[in-house]
Amino acid sequence: MSNEQKCPFSGTHGARTTVGTQSNRDWWPKVLNLNILHQHAPAANPMDADFDYSETFKTLDFGALKQDLYALMTTSQDWWPADWGHYGGLFIRMAWHSAGTYRTGDGRGGAGTGNQRFAPINSWPDNGNLDKARRLLWPIKQKYGNKISWADLMILAGNCALESMGFKTFGFGGGRVDIWQPEEDIYWGAEREWLATSDKPNSRYSGERNLDNPLAAVQMGLIYVNPEGPDGNPDPVASGRDIRETFARMAMNDEETVALTAGGHTFGKAHGAGDPALVGPEPEAAPIEEQGLGWINKFGSGKGIHATTSGIEGAWKPNPTKWDNGYFDMLFGYEWELTRSPAGAKQWVAKDCKPEHLIPDAHDPSKKHPPMMTTADLAMRFDPIYGPISRRFHQDPAAFADAFARAWFKLTHRDLGPKARYLGPEVPAEDLVWQDPIPAVDHPLIEVTDVASLKAKLLASGLSTAELVSTAWASASTFRGSDKRGGANGARIRLAPQKDWAANQPAQLAKVLGVLEGIQQAFNSAQTGGKKVSLADLIVLGGCAAVEAAAKAAGFAVAVPFTPGRTDASQEQTDAESIAVLEPEADGFRNYQKKTYSVSAEEMLVDKAQLLTLSAPEMTVLVGGLRVLGGNVGGSSDGVFTTTPGTLSNDFFVNLLDMGTVWKPAAESAGRYEGRDRQTGVAKWTASRVDLIFGSNSQLRALAEVYAQNDAQEKFVRDFIAAWSKVMELDRFDLK
């Protein structure tokens, strides 16, 4: 008789679990992924339902926490000894790599969620041995508990590392809320191999090194660029081109890029002491007994003098635990000779190094080493743009220190959103243009009676339901939950570049804004006591009034929630280049697509919905409602499945699911479809892929059926208003 026991549930040998089985996406890889709309469910969150991190953070003894972090920097542990007795370089790298996943294209990545704790980021090759940094932090996290999130603690540890080595940081803002499971919405690349070069299958590059959007890193598993050069080619000038594109996609200009590179490499060292083949698997693949630690190294002691991380070995300058101008002294003070580290990585060593510039070994005081530079470092000297900036910083240490302080602050706060979200005693007073500043309210706000009066004026202004709804949606739907940018507050839709975006229908927008500004000026000039209505509020109020009127036309007297308090930003407070990344390439809610893409229109709709923090039901009801309200760009009839446009009816769903209609691709236009009467062949409707996906995809069809039922009209109106109001207030952090 076999000693193998049968599974008590199935009666067969071996437990039957979902591990190893084919998922729906394995069977049907092209099926629309709606899971990204339902991430981070309350059931996955261990915190109490009423837990408020921002309120809890206010009870933190911030000064005591910083003192504990300072002490940590120089308390070396035998299980992972500190280089030169100071963990500063390690914690700077941890914070940098937490923030450095951010990219402007979709605002995803960054330090805002503490996602370095989870796959895939916790196991990226570029994050080697940062698991040890987080374990070193654990006693402090354990001590302060929920008063400080992992996301905030990792960034604050980086600040304290800099400060403990003599650098004055620009400030710190808390407010990053931890997630509890890996994100599913972030596209990190199509490669199936870590560190795959651009000549490998599924490359992120095409043509003449054109990097796939919205990616910023040059290889799968890297934070920025390959330090050895493009695809490992040790060409500093070519590396400079990679660096410029990558850092630009992470919101950094040339000066900020030089400051960050030089400032970060002022501290610590790279590790490549031995054969990388002796380094074990990353944390997600490590044996259970390692308890989440990866990269266990069998070379010597595997740590300290024997540590291998990137494979590059050495420090950039003397005094690696002290802020000074030594990086530039070395960069410009020597010629550099290409060599290989003990781990085989390509790097550069100072030729004929002077004795006073030899760097004591991080763990063996009897040894000294010449400074090293990576190929990416040499780009700071030999790139025609970076070179002059580097020389200016070399000659002006104060300018360098200020530039690095500001760039580091930007790096670590870029995805935290507007300044209103920042917490703690070290928030800088200065407003920075990349924060998309919005003026504070400095006047009495409109009251309930004013709102009613303004609604009446808006509805009597001659503007159509479609014009009012489209303008409000265009203003509010720029919001991105990823980096908390965009939204209706600030009324930047009236400023460059938003006023000229094709999706915003510039001619119609100019007309609508002209009417709204007239109503605004008439109201404000009639007030005593300084009461005002902002254009930002009026834009949203116009949409709300139009929705109410459309619901009334459908037989429902409803009030769409509206809370005043938005203000109007100026053009000087608006960085046009920075705002440009918010322009929609596609917006399925408006049946808009700028051009044809390799990604389907319905996938882009789901991506947009995720950035708007919408659920699948919210996405569904908004599409159906916006279609019948005339929300399509250019007045397109696609998806307008109603004979009463401007009425908030459930006609979109009723007619989409009507089996009396048969759909065929339109002959004249890819991605468009014609719906004809099944019996007579008479043309009835036209539609886009976005429209038809609500009848094609099984999950979305199930939702569409809810709203197409005979008893669904009131629910449809109620749900549409709730979802509409959510979008209108996504950026109202003053209300949260």
Curated annotation (Swiss-Prot):
Reactions that this protein is recorded to catalyse: H2O2 + AH2 = A + 2 H2O; 2 H2O2 = O2 + 2 H2O
GO molecular function terms listed in the Swiss-Prot or TrEMBL record: catalase activity; heme binding; metal ion binding
Post-translational modification: Formation of the three residue Trp-Tyr-Met cross-link is important for the catalase, but not the peroxidase activity of the enzyme.
Region (Disordered): 1-21
Entry keyword Iron: yes
Family annotation (CDD domains): catalase_peroxidase_1, catalase_peroxidase_2
Tryptophyl-tyrosyl-methioninium (Tyr-Met) (with W-96) cross-link, renumbered residues: Y224-M250
Site note Transition state stabilizer, residues: R93
Cofactor: heme b
Residues bound to heme b: H265
Active site (record annotation): H97 (proton acceptor)
Keyword set, alphabetical order: Heme, Hydrogen peroxide, Iron, Metal-binding, Oxidoreductase, Peroxidase
E.C. number: 1.11.1.21
InterPro entries linked: Catalase_peroxidase, Haem_peroxidase, Haem_peroxidase_sf, Peroxidases_AS
Origin superkingdom: Bacteria
Annotated GO CC locations: cytosol
Cofactor annotation comment: Binds 1 heme b (iron(II)-protoporphyrin IX) group per dimer.
Tryptophyl-tyrosyl-methioninium (Trp-Tyr) (with M-250) crosslink residues: W96-Y224
UniProt-listed GO biological process terms: cellular response to hydrogen peroxide; hydrogen peroxide catabolic process
Entry function: Bifunctional enzyme with both catalase and broad-spectrum peroxidase activity.
Subunit field text: Homodimer or homotetramer.
Family: Belongs to the peroxidase family. Peroxidase/catalase subfamily.
Name this polypeptide is given: Catalase-peroxidase
The species this protein was found in: Dechloromonas aromatica (strain RCB)
Encoding gene per record: katG
